[in-house]
Amino acid sequence: MAGYGALSDVYEWLIGDDKLTPAKAATVYYSDVVGSLPPHARVLDCACGTGQLAVGLASLGLDVVAADASDGMVRRTEKVASKQGVSLRALRASWDELPDHLEDSTFDLVFCVGNSLGHAEGAAGRLSALEAMSRLLKPGGRLVLTSRNWELVRAAGSRVDVRDRLIRRHDRDSVVSYYWQIEQRWEQEHFLEIVVAQIEPDGAVRACSERLSIWPYRYEDLVAQLRSAGLTVQSTTFNPESDGYLVVASRDQARGTPEPAR
């Protein structure tokens, strides 16, 4: 998984208002998964982005590790943590590198949110990522994963999506556009170019863009791969007609550390 080098500088224009601050980001998941954690529970956000969720969780007194494959995202997470006055560990690591930095079976909760899993390279890369997350969880620990409904994304075909309103951050407006390149077969590499066009005070437009690789997956394939990684779905919001969904899966109590994908 790679990318989010350029976009790390403008990522707040891609975050919804409901998750824009650390407090708001943590609140989104509090009632469903975070509120039941014991004090000082250990939590990993393994695709932390600019750190709103990780910092929000740390503000609740949780022992948080924030990881991302993008150096820029990790730097921004550290800056947000410093600004909020909270302590967390931030590290640059792709999913398959996480077990090299973190001890197996030590986390109560792992987050993989923000549609991040679609950047894992194909079915093999996706399974490897899920296995890495699973092995870091304590038996009975939970993985929280959010995803686009890739069935709907593919059905819509290649297209340009321009947001229908200006997005305002830091007293500056931007137009955000998504350029989708959808391939014929599920297993092919798809592409998404995101453009954030910032409108300067003098009326000039400054665009920041990045082309990202995507490997979409069907919901039933995700559930099967979770099972292969030793994770059992506890709850899901998947609806064939909804744009996205949330899955909570727990690591099997009786299963040992998953073998890495080959």
Regions found by a protein language model. Name each.
Residues 1-47:
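Conserved class I S-adenosyl-L-methionine
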Residues 52-98:
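Class I SAM-dependent methyltransferase SAM/SAH-binding core
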Residues 144-219:
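SAM-dependent methyltransferase
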Residues 215-262:
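C-terminal lobe and adjacent flexible extensions of AdoMet/dcAdoMet transferase-like proteins
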Residues 100-109:
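A short acidic, Gly/Pro-enriched loop at the edge of an enzyme's catalytic core
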Residues 127-139:
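A short glycine-rich, Lys/Arg-flanked "PGG" loop and its adjoining helix->strand segment in the class I
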Residues 108-124:
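A short SAM/SAH-binding and catalytic strip from SAM-dependent methyltransferases
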